[in-house]
Amino acid sequence: MAPSRYFDRRGFLRVAGASAAAAVSAGLIGACGEPLRDPEVPPLPDGLPPLDGRATSEFVPTDKATWRVQGNPLVAPTGDGPLAGLRVAVTDLYAVEGQQIGAGSGRRLADVPVETATAAAVARLLDSGAGVVGLAQTDDFGYGHSGVNLQFGTPANPEAGDRLPGGATSGAASAVAQGTADIGLGIDTTGSVRIPASYQGLFGFAPSRGAVSTEGLLPLSPTFDTPAWVCADLATLVAVSETLLPLRDEREFAAALSSDGINAVAEAGALRVVRDALSAWETSSLPRLTWTDTDIGQLPDWSEAVADVQGYEAWRLHGEWVAQALPSLSNEPRRNFVEAQRIWDSTYTRKMTLLAEASKTITTYIGDSVLVLPATSSPAPKRTGDPSGDRFRNTMRATGMLTCLATISGLPNATVPLRTGDGVPFGLCLVGPFGRDRDLLTLLKDLGDAGVLD
Protein backbone atom coordinates (compact mmCIF):
# COMPACT_ATOMS: atom_id res chain seq x y z
CA MET A 1 0.00 0.00 0.00
CA ALA A 2 1.47 3.36 -0.96
CA PRO A 3 1.77 5.70 2.03
CA SER A 4 -0.14 8.50 0.33
CA ARG A 5 -3.18 6.29 -0.13
CA TYR A 6 -3.87 6.51 3.57
CA PHE A 7 -5.07 10.07 3.17
CA ASP A 8 -6.33 9.96 -0.43
CA ARG A 9 -9.02 7.41 0.42
CA ARG A 10 -10.10 9.35 3.50
CA GLY A 11 -10.34 12.57 1.52
CA PHE A 12 -12.48 10.88 -1.10
CA LEU A 13 -14.96 9.50 1.42
CA ARG A 14 -15.23 12.43 3.81
CA VAL A 15 -17.18 14.52 1.31
CA ALA A 16 -19.67 16.14 3.67
CA GLY A 17 -17.05 16.69 6.36
CA ALA A 18 -14.70 18.82 4.27
CA SER A 19 -16.04 22.19 5.38
CA ALA A 20 -16.08 21.15 9.03
CA ALA A 21 -12.49 19.95 8.80
CA ALA A 22 -11.43 23.26 7.29
CA ALA A 23 -13.17 25.18 10.06
CA VAL A 24 -11.49 23.04 12.69
CA SER A 25 -8.01 23.49 11.22
CA ALA A 26 -8.57 27.23 10.98
CA GLY A 27 -9.69 27.94 14.51
CA LEU A 28 -9.91 24.95 16.85
CA ILE A 29 -7.54 26.27 19.48
CA GLY A 30 -9.20 29.67 19.60
CA ALA A 31 -12.67 28.16 19.85
CA CYS A 32 -12.04 25.34 22.28
CA GLY A 33 -9.04 26.39 24.35
CA GLU A 34 -5.44 25.21 24.57
CA PRO A 35 -5.19 21.40 24.51
CA LEU A 36 -3.49 19.69 27.42
CA ARG A 37 0.21 19.17 26.76
CA ASP A 38 2.91 17.02 28.33
CA PRO A 39 5.86 19.37 28.93
CA GLU A 40 8.30 16.54 28.19
CA VAL A 41 6.87 15.86 24.73
CA PRO A 42 7.23 18.39 21.90
CA PRO A 43 4.03 19.28 20.06
CA LEU A 44 3.26 17.43 16.86
CA PRO A 45 3.20 19.26 13.55
CA ASP A 46 -0.19 20.02 12.05
CA GLY A 47 -1.68 16.78 10.81
CA LEU A 48 -0.05 13.36 10.96
CA PRO A 49 2.72 12.31 8.57
CA PRO A 50 1.96 9.63 5.97
CA LEU A 51 2.02 6.05 7.18
CA ASP A 52 5.22 4.13 6.64
CA GLY A 53 3.67 1.07 5.01
CA ARG A 54 2.49 -1.29 7.76
CA ALA A 55 5.03 -0.13 10.34
CA THR A 56 3.61 1.01 13.67
CA SER A 57 4.56 3.75 16.06
CA GLU A 58 3.37 4.97 19.44
CA PHE A 59 3.65 8.39 21.05
CA VAL A 60 2.31 10.32 24.02
CA PRO A 61 -0.62 12.46 22.85
CA THR A 62 -0.53 16.21 23.29
CA ASP A 63 -4.34 16.31 23.46
CA LYS A 64 -4.76 14.08 26.50
CA ALA A 65 -8.43 14.98 26.87
CA THR A 66 -9.13 13.21 23.56
CA TRP A 67 -6.48 10.48 23.44
CA ARG A 68 -4.88 8.14 25.97
CA VAL A 69 -2.30 6.91 23.47
CA GLN A 70 -1.71 7.62 19.78
CA GLY A 71 0.34 6.12 16.96
CA ASN A 72 0.86 6.54 13.25
CA PRO A 73 -0.61 4.04 13.21
CA LEU A 74 -0.86 2.52 16.65
CA VAL A 75 -2.05 -0.68 14.98
CA ALA A 76 -1.49 -1.19 11.26
CA PRO A 77 -4.13 -2.64 8.94
CA THR A 78 -4.10 -6.42 8.62
CA GLY A 79 -5.90 -6.45 5.28
CA ASP A 80 -6.60 -4.30 2.24
CA GLY A 81 -10.33 -3.80 1.85
CA PRO A 82 -13.04 -1.16 1.51
CA LEU A 83 -11.76 0.85 4.49
CA ALA A 84 -8.18 1.11 3.20
CA GLY A 85 -6.61 4.38 4.30
CA LEU A 86 -9.17 5.25 6.97
CA ARG A 87 -8.06 6.11 10.51
CA VAL A 88 -9.85 4.64 13.53
CA ALA A 89 -10.10 6.15 16.99
CA VAL A 90 -10.93 3.23 19.28
CA THR A 91 -12.66 4.10 22.53
CA ASP A 92 -10.53 2.91 25.45
CA LEU A 93 -13.07 0.25 26.36
CA TYR A 94 -11.92 -2.19 23.67
CA ALA A 95 -9.09 -4.70 23.89
CA VAL A 96 -6.19 -3.91 21.58
CA GLU A 97 -3.30 -6.36 21.63
CA GLY A 98 -0.30 -4.87 23.42
CA GLN A 99 -2.36 -2.17 25.18
CA GLN A 100 -4.30 -1.97 28.43
CA ILE A 101 -8.00 -1.10 28.67
CA GLY A 102 -7.93 2.17 30.60
CA ALA A 103 -11.70 2.78 30.57
CA GLY A 104 -11.16 6.48 31.21
CA SER A 105 -9.45 5.82 34.55
CA GLY A 106 -5.79 6.51 35.18
CA ARG A 107 -5.95 4.51 38.38
CA ARG A 108 -7.28 1.45 36.57
CA LEU A 109 -4.15 1.35 34.40
CA ALA A 110 -2.13 0.45 37.50
CA ASP A 111 -4.30 -2.62 38.11
CA VAL A 112 -4.97 -4.24 34.73
CA PRO A 113 -2.74 -6.31 32.43
CA VAL A 114 -1.78 -5.67 28.83
CA GLU A 115 -4.27 -7.28 26.43
CA THR A 116 -3.08 -10.30 24.47
CA ALA A 117 -5.77 -10.18 21.78
CA THR A 118 -7.72 -7.54 19.88
CA ALA A 119 -11.49 -7.07 20.19
CA ALA A 120 -13.55 -8.60 17.40
CA ALA A 121 -14.97 -5.30 16.07
CA VAL A 122 -11.52 -3.68 16.01
CA ALA A 123 -10.05 -6.71 14.24
CA ARG A 124 -12.78 -6.53 11.61
CA LEU A 125 -11.93 -2.90 10.84
CA LEU A 126 -8.21 -3.72 10.62
CA ASP A 127 -8.96 -6.63 8.31
CA SER A 128 -10.86 -4.26 6.01
CA GLY A 129 -7.89 -1.92 5.60
CA ALA A 130 -8.37 0.67 8.34
CA GLY A 131 -5.58 1.53 10.78
CA VAL A 132 -5.96 2.33 14.47
CA VAL A 133 -4.42 5.74 15.21
CA GLY A 134 -5.14 5.80 18.91
CA LEU A 135 -7.15 4.83 21.97
CA ALA A 136 -9.63 7.58 22.75
CA GLN A 137 -10.77 8.80 26.15
CA THR A 138 -14.17 8.06 27.64
CA ASP A 139 -16.22 8.76 30.75
CA ASP A 140 -15.03 6.42 33.54
CA PHE A 141 -16.05 2.87 32.55
CA GLY A 142 -18.26 4.39 29.85
CA TYR A 143 -20.74 5.25 32.61
CA GLY A 144 -21.59 8.84 31.74
CA HIS A 145 -23.05 10.99 28.99
CA SER A 146 -21.31 14.33 29.53
CA GLY A 147 -17.84 13.48 28.26
CA VAL A 148 -16.29 15.20 31.29
CA ASN A 149 -13.27 13.33 32.67
CA LEU A 150 -11.64 14.94 35.71
CA GLN A 151 -8.35 13.06 35.31
CA PHE A 152 -7.68 13.74 31.65
CA GLY A 153 -9.89 16.70 30.78
CA THR A 154 -12.96 17.21 28.61
CA PRO A 155 -12.55 16.58 24.87
CA ALA A 156 -13.29 19.47 22.55
CA ASN A 157 -16.59 19.89 20.76
CA PRO A 158 -15.24 21.55 17.58
CA GLU A 159 -18.70 22.38 16.25
CA ALA A 160 -19.80 24.07 19.49
CA GLY A 161 -16.73 25.08 21.45
CA ASP A 162 -18.57 26.24 24.57
CA ARG A 163 -20.58 23.02 24.86
CA LEU A 164 -19.96 19.49 26.13
CA PRO A 165 -18.87 16.77 23.69
CA GLY A 166 -21.25 14.14 25.05
CA GLY A 167 -20.31 10.66 26.15
CA ALA A 168 -19.38 8.03 26.70
CA THR A 169 -17.85 7.91 23.19
CA SER A 170 -16.48 11.37 23.89
CA GLY A 171 -12.86 11.17 22.77
CA ALA A 172 -13.50 9.15 19.61
CA ALA A 173 -16.32 11.47 18.54
CA SER A 174 -14.16 14.52 19.21
CA ALA A 175 -11.30 13.03 17.19
CA VAL A 176 -13.62 12.52 14.23
CA ALA A 177 -15.07 16.02 14.56
CA GLN A 178 -11.54 17.48 14.74
CA GLY A 179 -10.46 15.52 11.65
CA THR A 180 -7.77 13.46 13.39
CA ALA A 181 -9.74 10.25 12.80
CA ASP A 182 -12.26 9.11 10.21
CA ILE A 183 -14.01 6.46 12.30
CA GLY A 184 -14.84 6.66 15.99
CA LEU A 185 -15.52 3.17 17.37
CA GLY A 186 -17.48 3.40 20.59
CA ILE A 187 -20.20 1.73 22.60
CA ASP A 188 -23.90 2.55 22.68
CA THR A 189 -25.24 1.04 25.89
CA THR A 190 -27.98 3.58 26.57
CA GLY A 191 -27.09 6.30 24.05
CA SER A 192 -23.32 6.68 24.31
CA VAL A 193 -22.90 7.09 20.54
CA ARG A 194 -26.23 8.75 19.80
CA ILE A 195 -25.56 11.55 22.29
CA PRO A 196 -22.06 12.63 21.16
CA ALA A 197 -23.13 12.29 17.52
CA SER A 198 -26.05 14.64 18.17
CA TYR A 199 -23.94 17.08 20.19
CA GLN A 200 -21.05 17.23 17.70
CA GLY A 201 -22.85 17.18 14.36
CA LEU A 202 -21.77 13.66 13.38
CA PHE A 203 -23.35 10.62 11.76
CA GLY A 204 -23.75 7.70 14.15
CA PHE A 205 -24.89 4.09 13.85
CA ALA A 206 -25.77 1.50 16.50
CA PRO A 207 -26.68 -1.95 15.13
CA SER A 208 -29.31 -4.42 16.23
CA ARG A 209 -28.08 -5.84 19.52
CA GLY A 210 -25.95 -8.89 18.82
CA ALA A 211 -25.35 -8.04 15.16
CA VAL A 212 -21.75 -6.97 15.91
CA SER A 213 -19.70 -8.96 18.40
CA THR A 214 -18.92 -7.51 21.84
CA GLU A 215 -15.97 -9.89 22.25
CA GLY A 216 -13.09 -7.91 23.74
CA LEU A 217 -15.31 -5.00 24.81
CA LEU A 218 -15.22 -4.11 28.51
CA PRO A 219 -18.85 -4.66 29.55
CA LEU A 220 -20.89 -2.09 31.43
CA SER A 221 -24.40 -3.50 31.10
CA PRO A 222 -24.53 -6.72 29.03
CA THR A 223 -28.30 -6.39 28.60
CA PHE A 224 -27.76 -3.24 26.53
CA ASP A 225 -24.09 -3.09 25.42
CA THR A 226 -23.42 -2.91 21.68
CA PRO A 227 -20.53 -1.63 19.57
CA ALA A 228 -21.41 1.52 17.63
CA TRP A 229 -19.58 4.11 15.55
CA VAL A 230 -19.48 7.75 14.46
CA CYS A 231 -18.22 9.33 11.24
CA ALA A 232 -18.12 12.87 9.90
CA ASP A 233 -19.88 12.04 6.63
CA LEU A 234 -22.47 9.64 5.32
CA ALA A 235 -20.21 7.89 2.81
CA THR A 236 -17.77 6.81 5.52
CA LEU A 237 -20.58 5.75 7.85
CA VAL A 238 -22.06 3.54 5.15
CA ALA A 239 -18.67 2.01 4.32
CA VAL A 240 -17.97 1.17 7.96
CA SER A 241 -21.48 -0.17 8.56
CA GLU A 242 -21.40 -2.38 5.49
CA THR A 243 -18.10 -3.80 6.73
CA LEU A 244 -19.28 -4.60 10.26
CA LEU A 245 -22.89 -5.65 9.69
CA PRO A 246 -23.95 -9.19 8.73
CA LEU A 247 -25.40 -9.72 5.28
CA ARG A 248 -29.21 -9.76 5.10
CA ASP A 249 -31.82 -9.54 2.36
CA GLU A 250 -32.81 -5.91 1.87
CA ARG A 251 -36.27 -4.44 1.39
CA GLU A 252 -37.96 -1.07 1.74
CA PHE A 253 -39.69 0.09 4.89
CA ALA A 254 -43.48 0.09 4.81
CA ALA A 255 -43.61 3.65 6.13
CA ALA A 256 -41.96 6.15 8.43
CA LEU A 257 -43.53 6.99 11.79
CA SER A 258 -43.31 10.09 13.91
CA SER A 259 -45.18 11.24 16.98
CA ASP A 260 -45.86 14.76 18.21
CA GLY A 261 -45.95 13.38 21.74
CA ILE A 262 -42.52 11.74 21.52
CA ASN A 263 -41.00 14.69 19.66
CA ALA A 264 -42.28 17.13 22.28
CA VAL A 265 -39.88 15.61 24.81
CA ALA A 266 -37.25 17.78 23.06
CA GLU A 267 -36.91 21.44 24.00
CA ALA A 268 -38.53 24.07 21.77
CA GLY A 269 -35.49 25.07 19.70
CA ALA A 270 -34.59 21.48 18.92
CA LEU A 271 -38.21 20.61 18.19
CA ARG A 272 -38.36 23.28 15.47
CA VAL A 273 -35.39 21.66 13.72
CA VAL A 274 -37.05 18.25 13.86
CA ARG A 275 -40.32 19.62 12.45
CA ASP A 276 -38.48 21.33 9.58
CA ALA A 277 -36.74 18.07 8.71
CA LEU A 278 -40.01 16.14 8.85
CA SER A 279 -41.70 18.73 6.62
CA ALA A 280 -38.97 18.16 4.05
CA TRP A 281 -39.46 14.40 4.46
CA GLU A 282 -43.19 14.70 3.69
CA THR A 283 -42.52 16.36 0.33
CA SER A 284 -39.80 13.89 -0.68
CA SER A 285 -39.82 10.45 -2.27
CA LEU A 286 -38.85 8.81 1.02
CA PRO A 287 -41.20 6.25 2.65
CA ARG A 288 -44.56 7.83 3.45
CA LEU A 289 -44.48 9.66 6.80
CA THR A 290 -47.33 8.68 9.13
CA TRP A 291 -48.11 10.70 12.24
CA THR A 292 -49.16 8.60 15.23
CA ASP A 293 -51.09 9.54 18.36
CA THR A 294 -48.75 8.01 20.91
CA ASP A 295 -49.30 7.74 24.65
CA ILE A 296 -45.94 8.75 26.13
CA GLY A 297 -47.04 8.30 29.73
CA GLN A 298 -44.90 5.18 30.09
CA LEU A 299 -41.67 6.75 28.82
CA PRO A 300 -40.46 7.99 32.24
CA ASP A 301 -40.97 4.54 33.79
CA TRP A 302 -39.27 2.82 30.85
CA SER A 303 -36.31 5.18 30.95
CA GLU A 304 -35.94 4.74 34.71
CA ALA A 305 -36.04 0.96 34.28
CA VAL A 306 -33.24 1.14 31.71
CA ALA A 307 -31.13 3.20 34.12
CA ASP A 308 -31.78 0.78 36.99
CA VAL A 309 -30.92 -2.31 34.95
CA GLN A 310 -27.77 -0.64 33.65
CA GLY A 311 -26.77 0.43 37.15
CA TYR A 312 -27.39 -2.96 38.72
CA GLU A 313 -25.30 -4.73 36.10
CA ALA A 314 -22.54 -2.10 36.17
CA TRP A 315 -22.14 -2.44 39.93
CA ARG A 316 -22.12 -6.26 39.81
CA LEU A 317 -19.37 -6.12 37.18
CA HIS A 318 -17.19 -3.32 38.53
CA GLY A 319 -18.40 -2.50 42.04
CA GLU A 320 -15.65 -4.31 43.93
CA TRP A 321 -12.93 -2.29 42.19
CA VAL A 322 -14.93 0.94 42.06
CA ALA A 323 -15.61 0.82 45.81
CA GLN A 324 -11.85 1.09 46.43
CA ALA A 325 -11.32 3.83 43.85
CA LEU A 326 -14.50 5.91 44.08
CA PRO A 327 -12.76 9.25 44.87
CA SER A 328 -10.70 8.95 41.66
CA LEU A 329 -13.78 8.83 39.42
CA SER A 330 -15.26 11.85 37.67
CA ASN A 331 -18.38 13.37 39.20
CA GLU A 332 -21.01 11.89 36.88
CA PRO A 333 -19.77 8.26 36.85
CA ARG A 334 -19.09 8.44 40.60
CA ARG A 335 -22.66 9.53 41.33
CA ASN A 336 -23.97 6.86 38.94
CA PHE A 337 -22.01 4.12 40.71
CA VAL A 338 -23.02 5.35 44.18
CA GLU A 339 -26.67 5.12 43.16
CA ALA A 340 -26.13 1.79 41.39
CA GLN A 341 -24.93 0.01 44.53
CA ARG A 342 -28.32 0.70 46.15
CA ILE A 343 -30.35 -1.18 43.52
CA TRP A 344 -31.77 -4.35 45.07
CA ASP A 345 -32.00 -7.75 43.37
CA SER A 346 -35.79 -7.53 43.59
CA THR A 347 -35.76 -4.12 41.88
CA TYR A 348 -33.64 -5.51 39.05
CA THR A 349 -36.00 -8.45 38.55
CA ARG A 350 -39.04 -6.17 38.56
CA LYS A 351 -37.48 -3.72 36.10
CA MET A 352 -36.43 -6.51 33.73
CA THR A 353 -40.03 -7.73 33.68
CA LEU A 354 -41.23 -4.20 32.92
CA LEU A 355 -38.72 -3.87 30.07
CA ALA A 356 -39.78 -7.20 28.56
CA GLU A 357 -43.35 -5.89 28.30
CA ALA A 358 -42.11 -2.52 27.04
CA SER A 359 -40.11 -4.25 24.32
CA LYS A 360 -43.25 -5.97 23.01
CA THR A 361 -45.08 -2.63 22.94
CA ILE A 362 -42.25 -0.85 21.10
CA THR A 363 -41.76 -3.65 18.59
CA THR A 364 -45.48 -3.73 17.80
CA TYR A 365 -45.61 0.06 17.48
CA ILE A 366 -42.73 0.27 14.99
CA GLY A 367 -43.78 -2.85 13.10
CA ASP A 368 -42.25 -2.85 9.62
CA SER A 369 -41.67 0.91 9.61
CA VAL A 370 -38.92 3.27 10.72
CA LEU A 371 -39.43 5.62 13.66
CA VAL A 372 -38.13 9.19 13.27
CA LEU A 373 -37.52 11.20 16.46
CA PRO A 374 -35.04 13.60 18.09
CA ALA A 375 -31.74 11.92 18.97
CA THR A 376 -31.46 13.92 22.21
CA SER A 377 -33.73 16.24 24.14
CA SER A 378 -31.55 19.27 23.43
CA PRO A 379 -28.30 20.39 21.84
CA ALA A 380 -25.20 19.88 23.98
CA PRO A 381 -25.34 21.60 27.38
CA LYS A 382 -22.78 24.30 28.12
CA ARG A 383 -19.40 23.19 29.48
CA THR A 384 -19.78 25.39 32.56
CA GLY A 385 -22.40 23.16 34.21
CA ASP A 386 -21.81 20.30 36.64
CA PRO A 387 -22.60 16.95 34.96
CA SER A 388 -23.45 15.45 38.34
CA GLY A 389 -25.83 18.33 39.12
CA ASP A 390 -29.60 18.30 38.87
CA ARG A 391 -29.86 20.47 35.76
CA PHE A 392 -27.70 18.17 33.64
CA ARG A 393 -29.36 15.09 35.09
CA ASN A 394 -32.81 16.43 34.19
CA THR A 395 -31.60 16.99 30.62
CA MET A 396 -30.31 13.42 30.53
CA ARG A 397 -33.59 12.07 31.94
CA ALA A 398 -35.45 13.71 29.06
CA THR A 399 -32.90 12.36 26.58
CA GLY A 400 -33.30 8.93 28.17
CA MET A 401 -37.02 8.99 27.36
CA LEU A 402 -36.02 9.28 23.69
CA THR A 403 -33.07 6.88 23.60
CA CYS A 404 -34.86 4.14 25.57
CA LEU A 405 -37.13 3.32 22.63
CA ALA A 406 -34.25 1.76 20.67
CA THR A 407 -32.31 0.63 23.74
CA ILE A 408 -35.06 -1.51 25.27
CA SER A 409 -35.60 -3.66 22.18
CA GLY A 410 -32.02 -3.54 20.89
CA LEU A 411 -33.16 -1.89 17.66
CA PRO A 412 -30.81 -0.53 14.98
CA ASN A 413 -30.63 3.23 14.95
CA ALA A 414 -28.86 5.98 13.06
CA THR A 415 -28.17 9.57 14.07
CA VAL A 416 -27.93 12.22 11.36
CA PRO A 417 -26.76 15.81 11.92
CA LEU A 418 -29.02 18.84 11.77
CA ARG A 419 -28.51 22.42 13.01
CA THR A 420 -30.62 24.69 15.17
CA GLY A 421 -31.48 28.20 13.99
CA ASP A 422 -28.34 29.56 15.64
CA GLY A 423 -26.11 26.90 14.09
CA VAL A 424 -25.71 24.53 17.04
CA PRO A 425 -25.51 20.80 16.16
CA PHE A 426 -28.49 18.61 16.95
CA GLY A 427 -29.28 15.09 15.77
CA LEU A 428 -32.26 13.37 14.20
CA CYS A 429 -32.57 9.66 15.02
CA LEU A 430 -34.00 6.90 12.82
CA VAL A 431 -34.94 3.63 14.55
CA GLY A 432 -35.63 0.54 12.47
CA PRO A 433 -37.08 -2.91 13.21
CA PHE A 434 -34.75 -5.50 14.69
CA GLY A 435 -32.43 -7.00 12.07
CA ARG A 436 -33.21 -4.36 9.43
CA ASP A 437 -29.80 -2.67 9.81
CA ARG A 438 -28.90 -2.69 6.12
CA ASP A 439 -32.33 -1.40 5.17
CA LEU A 440 -31.70 1.49 7.54
CA LEU A 441 -28.41 2.16 5.74
CA THR A 442 -30.22 2.27 2.40
CA LEU A 443 -32.72 4.74 3.84
CA LEU A 444 -29.85 6.91 5.10
CA LYS A 445 -28.44 7.14 1.58
CA ASP A 446 -31.87 8.08 0.25
CA LEU A 447 -32.18 10.65 3.03
CA GLY A 448 -29.06 12.41 1.83
CA ASP A 449 -30.30 12.44 -1.76
CA ALA A 450 -33.73 13.77 -0.71
CA GLY A 451 -32.34 16.96 0.80
CA VAL A 452 -33.76 16.36 4.28
CA LEU A 453 -30.34 17.02 5.80
CA ASP A 454 -29.82 20.35 3.99
Give the ranges of each region predicted by the language model.
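Structural helix-boundary/capping segments
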Residues: L13, P39-R54, E58, I183, ...
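Glycine-rich, small-residue loops and helix-cap segments
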Residues: D46-G47, T91, T349-D454
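Gly/Ser-rich catalytic/binding loops embedded in alpha/beta enzyme cores
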Residues: E34-P35, P39-A181, T363-T364
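N-terminal export leaders
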Residues: R9-G17
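N-terminal secretory signal peptides
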Residues: M1-D8, A22, A26
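Short helix-loop capping/hinge segments that flank enzyme active sites or metal/cofactor-binding pockets
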Residues: G85-R108, A307-L354, P417-V424
